[in-house]
Every structure is written in C-alpha cells, then in structure tokens.
C-alpha cells in the first residue's frame, strides 16, 4: 500500500484553519466590543473584567436608587409647599375670627373654610410615592454606592401630635377651631408653631437632597 502525502496541501489547509479561527475571533470581538471573547484569550484579564462589570452594574443600580430618593424628597417638598400655603390662609382666618366686630355667623363661615384646609393638610399626610409613605416618623434608608453603604434620610412626620415637631395640632379640629375669639387665639398659636415646624421639616428635606446629590 502506498500512502501519498502532500505536505504543501496539509500546510495550506492548516494555515487556512488558523486564518478562519482568527477571523471568527476578530468578528466576535468586533460584534461584542470586547477584547476577551473566550477565557483562553486572557484568563486573568477576564477575571478582572468580570469584577469591573459587576461593580459597574452595582454602581448603576445605586445611581438609580439615588435618583429615586431625590424624586421622593422633591415630591415631599412639593406637597409641603402646598401645606405652607394652606397654613398661611388658616393663620389669616384665625386673625379674622378674633375681630370683635364679627358675629358668630361670620365666624361660622370662616370655620367652614378653616375646616376644609385642615382636612386638606390631613389628607396630604397620607400621600405616598410608589406606595411608600411620604410622611412618617422613621427615615428611609438609601443604598448609595456599589459597596452597599447606606444613608438614612431625615424623617418628616407631619402627623406628629408633638407640638414642637409636628403639624397635627394645627389640623386637628379638637385642638384648633375658630368658632370663638378664644378658640381662634389658641388656634393661631398652634398654626404659628406648625408653620415653624414645617419650615424645619423642609430644611431637613433640603439636607436630604443635598446629601443624595453629593
């Protein structure tokens, strides 16, 4: 038996195979935009690349968390601007109700609007952002980076009945009413305190936004 061997043809075929593999790899690199297509391209480089890719994904998620937290805080402040306007009008009504030339009927008319504004503020206190309460006694915790470090936002509790911190005494009809000059005077005191408390809360929200944007 005679076995014919064409070395030139075999060498050419081998070279063609190498060229085809290199072309396939080059096309894969072009299509993926990655220098490392297979582990054998650069085993150590692949390990480093995988770590970076995972960290980038976590960073992206953390940035998304921060953006949502800022939107949450801005929504809080938007509602609190409306509360500020309502409290200003309530304060005006309490002063009008203390006018000695006003009759009980006049005060009753003022009370209708006053009560509506109380209900308006009370309703705002129940608002939520994607089902997360906007106003509560506990600050929300936000993951702010890829290493899972967190930042606890300042709590904003408008429903607190504590006179020095909340607004409830201003929008609760049992503690603030303007049917008489005496009750109107007491209501005005509650509203003045609530206006200051609201300003403090908005300052806390501003601090939250500032920290989240750092």
Show where each model-derived region lies:
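Parallel, heptad-repeat alpha-helical coiled-coil signal-transduction segments
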Residues: 15-24, 50-64
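Amphipathic alpha-helical coiled-coil/heptad-repeat segments
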Residues: 1-9, 35-38, 50, 54, ...
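Alpha-helical transmembrane segments of multi-pass integral membrane proteins
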Residues: 14, 213-214
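Donor-binding/catalytic cores of nucleotide-activated saccharide
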Residues: 4-24, 28
